[in-house]
Regions:
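N-terminal catalytic scaffold of extracellular/periplasmic and nuclease hydrolases
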Residues: 2-170
């Protein structure tokens, strides 16, 4: 072509669909209340005239929530059933994780609840990562994958990590 010809083309432009999350990070400050954050801020940044002299990195997180928890058998929670509620969206009894607790002798035969991380992996191919500053079999990190009525069953909980195969475990 010599560049003298022109053509008109009609394009139909469609809006893109809603963005889907690539990753979800749930940061759990086990036992971390607003009072603990205030104390950390005052001790690390200093105080003048009743006000903190700086902010913590957590203060700039774009999304944050405070959750009041209660177990299925008590208004007082422990790390196991509160972390299980975060991980599954279902309440359970004290010392239980990922189950509807019953009264049978076997703490591993209770009806199971699928953790949200497992659902995200199964349905959307997302990865599961668990990073903790305590032992992985401790109640808060274990609630991401464990199914038991007995939070102190550490050997069995570790075996459940091998079965769940999280992509990151530190």
């Amino acid at each position: 072509s010599d560049g003298t010809q022109s053509r008109t083309v009609a394009w139909t432009v469609f809006d893109t669909g809603p963005r889907k999350a690539k990753n979800v990070i749930l940061f759990v400050g086990d036992g971390l209340s607003p009072a603990h954050r205030v104390a950390a801020r005052l001790l690390s940044k200093g105080i003048a005239e009743g006000k903190s002299l700086g902010k913590l990195a957590i203060d700039d997180m774009p999304h944050m929530a405070l959750v009041a928890t209660a177990g299925s058998d008590s208004i007082i929670t422990d790390s196991a059933n509160s972390a299980s509620a975060y991980a599954t969206g279902h309440k359970t009894a004290a010392n239980a994780m990922g189950v509807y607790a019953d009264r049978t002798a076997n703490p591993f035969d209770d009806p199971r609840v699928e953790p949200l991380a497992s659902l995200a992996k199964r349905r959307h191919g997302m990865g599961i990562g668990i990073v903790t500053n305590t032992e992985i079999e401790d109640a808060t990190p274990a609630a991401v994958v464990a199914h038991t009525r007995r939070r102190a069953a550490y050997d069995e909980i570790v075996a459940q990590f091998f079965a769940a195969r999280p992509d990151v475990l530190m």
